[in-house]
């Protein structure tokens, strides 16, 4: 661990193993160290009078952003300070009590909606800063390749931002819409059923597909990245297991285009399209981009939602090993 950050920003970041006590202690150490420098994130100094892990974690969450200068737009161009501090903040949230995490997010929202620039020429600064933090939030919580990817936490962020009394109507509407979609088909919930038409022009129900595990793969035949990802999935030995069925669905409305495309997917996969693109036009599933992947269990409960390829394969290895015993 670096004294000035719980982990470094990098593409292969892994979850730190801190307990709440270690988190609070680490933040105290970091705050003392950063007090002596000018280029690091200004972590809060935890009072010595706070002895329990819970009170120390609560203090860190409530005061994490107190010493950060939100009016300084140059900090948007210093990822070693701002992005590092934000990434560490995101990493802490699942490690503290949910109520404590909520207070931390609310404190950040209050700062973002109370930026004082002091100059008339800087009237756009608050919006620029909020947009910057919105981009960071999407990067760390919304990107399936991020080790901190968490749709539920992302939705909580957006809900809290939307609920701030200083949020504009446009901000509130946008954040509420995004949060509502992110909450659809979360891990642990039953995946919403839908109708699809298969390659034999037969109408089917997703829930009627009999399989120990279903890999639901939303794709577009004109999407190169979709074919690259499909090839990676097909190369996994686990997807050849009788315990796994792959259902590849075109979720958009141009079904005639889909019908004219020769399949490039494995013959063992079930393919189909959503009639009239109902999956997306009716917001049955929130598909921000394709490919979009869900792993479902036998009862069609969501096990994984848009996992990284590595997480998907590791999970399939465990599940197929158990299923085949």
Annotated model-derived regions:
Residues 205-230, 246-247:
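Short active-site neighborhood of thiol/selenol oxidoreductases, capturing the structured segment around
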Residues 1-40:
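Bacterial Sec-dependent N-terminal signal peptides
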Residues 36-201:
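Oxidative protein folding and maturation machinery
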Residues 227-263, 277-281:
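Structural microenvironment flanking redox-active thiols in thiol-disulfide oxidoreductases
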Residues 277-317:
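Thiol/disulfide oxidoreductase modules built on the thioredoxin-like
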Residues 245, 268-270:
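Conserved beta-strand segments of alpha/beta enzyme cores
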